[in-house]
Curated annotation (Swiss-Prot):
Molecular functions per Gene Ontology: ATP binding; cysteine-tRNA ligase activity; zinc ion binding
Protein name: Cysteine--tRNA ligase
Organism per entry: Acidovorax ebreus (strain TPSY)
Enzyme class name: ligase
Cystine pairings recorded for this chain: none
Superkingdom field: Bacteria
GO cellular component labels: cytosol
Reactions accelerated catalytically: tRNA(Cys) + L-cysteine + ATP = L-cysteinyl-tRNA(Cys) + AMP + diphosphate
Amino acids binding Zn(2+): C29, C213, H238, E242
Motif ('KMSKS' region) on chain: 270-274
NCBIfam families, per database record: cysS
Length: 458
């Protein structure tokens, strides 16, 4: 196949061919469910949703795993603050996650494992690492990974151990042999709730964050699989540590290809609660429809930084409206996409080059121009069919355009009736006012011998 993907591990575009012909196995780091999902989560979910959609469009079967971290220091802290159990908090946040993902048109992954369901596999991997001399139990009961005993450490981040150590601000403490060593198993503390403690050969405790993904990935996809993805902020230390754990335990390459989506900023500043520019998905969906948010993400390349602002969202809304306006002109005909021809070939070439969604979106606009000129049902059908691969343009055009105008059909028809009554009473100033008010809301009235109809402004 002709698909090329940028591999963070090799720092190069690589021709993609799955380990098992015709079947892609992909793992993406999911959410830590102590709070509502934010914009950064939305970007990652949308980016890898597009990836799995295009892999399937390319004729490949996809086993897609996106995990849920449901045990973590932040989860424990929040549950204690709320006076609820860990399970109560995480169940509630997982329900909210699914609602947000569904709103954004995210297709459910094949598997969505909860970390707490895989503690036995984590303990097995820790035992293997200890048996190979790659892990040790410290005096405080924690089990740590001995980073300097794994020769490949730093290959994902591209840094030597000395460089990493120079940047490490944490002093050697709690029995660590080296500041770079990281925890595999956290010894239980007396003050911690009972529902965050598991029995183990190392004493009561809970798993560290990094070992969770290694164990779940190997359990569901095998010791070596095709793609591992996540946000750029996870490249180090999380993904570096996953490689050390998994390859240290199995002696095999963990993931052949590593993909990382770019950061999201707000008005050119890093999104953070301390700056007061932190937005949940639900905050954004109060102001913008979900497809506009998805379009805003998709029209930038997944590896590029993405700057959130009302100006950019307004622009995304206006751009998406232009595509739906084209679809409103003629009923799309069902089409069988011929990937070797014209617009479809250009779309495919864009997506086959590291999921080039900006170029693919440009093809959609060119095709929308063709629909505007020709009013061709086949061209409209192709526009809708190509949009589906990005999770776009599947709504009824009139419904989308009416929602954007802030009016429903009944409200528009009421205004049309009021205008007709004004004209009948020869109150032409009022009739013109109604027409102009609707135009300001993106609604164009069309008068004819049979009555008045409306369409969205182009």
């Amino acid at each position: 196949m002709s698909l090329r993907i940028y591999n963070t591990l090799s720092r190069a575009l690589e021709e993609f061919s799955p380990i098992e012909p015709g079947h892609v196995r992909m793992y993406v780091c999911g959410m830590t469910v102590y709070d509502l999902c934010h914009l950064g989560h939305a970007r990652s979910m949308i980016a890898f949703d597009v990836v799995q959609r295009w892999l399937r469009a390319s004729g490949l079967a996809v086993t897609y795993v996106r995990n849920i971290t449901d045990i973590d220091d932040k989860i424990i802290k929040r549950a204690v603050e709320n006076g609820e159990t860990i399970r109560s908090l995480t169940d509630r946040m997982i329900d909210a996650l699914h609602q947000d993902a569904d709103a954004l048109g995210i297709e459910r992954p094949t598997h969505e494992p909860r970390a707490t369901a895989y503690v036995p596999q984590m303990l097995d991997m820790i035992g293997t690492l200890q048996g190979k001399g790659l892990a040790y139990q410290a005096g405080n009961g924690d089990v740590n990974y001995a980073v300097r005993k794994f020769p490949g450490y730093g290959k994902l981040s591209g840094k030597s151990l000395d460089e990493l150590n120079a940047g490490e601000r944490v002093a050697v403490q709690d029995g660590k042999h080296d500041p770079l060593d990281f925890v595999l198993w956290k010894s239980a503390k007396p003050e911690e709730p009972a529902d965050v403690k598991w029995r183990s050969p190392f004493g009561e405790g809970r798993p560290g964050w990094h070992i969770e993904c290694s164990a779940m990935g190997c359990a569901l996809l095998g010791e070596s699989f095709d793609i591992h993805g996540g946000g750029a902020d996870l490249q180090f230390p999380h993904h570096e540590n996953e490689i050390a754990q998994s390859e240290g335990a199995t002696g095999k390459p963990f993931a052949r290809l590593w993909m990382h989506n770019g950061f999201i900023n707000v008005d050119n500043e890093k999104m953070s609660k301390s700056l007061g520019n932190f937005f949940t998905i639900r905050d954004v969906l109060k102001e913008y429809d979900a497809e506009t948010v998805r379009f805003f993400v998709v029209r930038s390349h997944y590896r590029s930084p993405l700057n959130y602002s009302n100006v950019h969202l307004d622009d995304a809304r206006a751009a998406l409206k232009r595509l739906y306006t084209a679809l409103s002109l003629v009923a799309p005909a069902p089409v069988e996409v011929d990937w070797a021809e014209g617009y479809a070939a250009r779309f495919k070439a864009a997506m086959d080059e590291d999921f080039g969604t900006p170029e693919a979106v440009a093809v959609l606009f060119d095709l929308a121009g063709e629909v505007n000129r020709s009013k061709s049902p086949a061209a409209a059908g192709l526009l809708k069919a190509l949009g589906r691969h990005l999770g776009l343009l599947q709504a009824d055009p009139q419904d989308f355009l009416k929602a954007g105008a802030g009016l429903d059909e009944a409200a528009i028809q009421a205004q049309i009736a009021a205008r007709a009554a004004a004209k009948a009473a020869k109150n032409f100033a009022e009739a013109d006012r109604i027409r102009n008010d609707l135009l300001a809301q993106g609604i164009v009235l069309k008068d004819s011998a049979t009555g008045t109809t409306w369409e969205a402004a182009q």
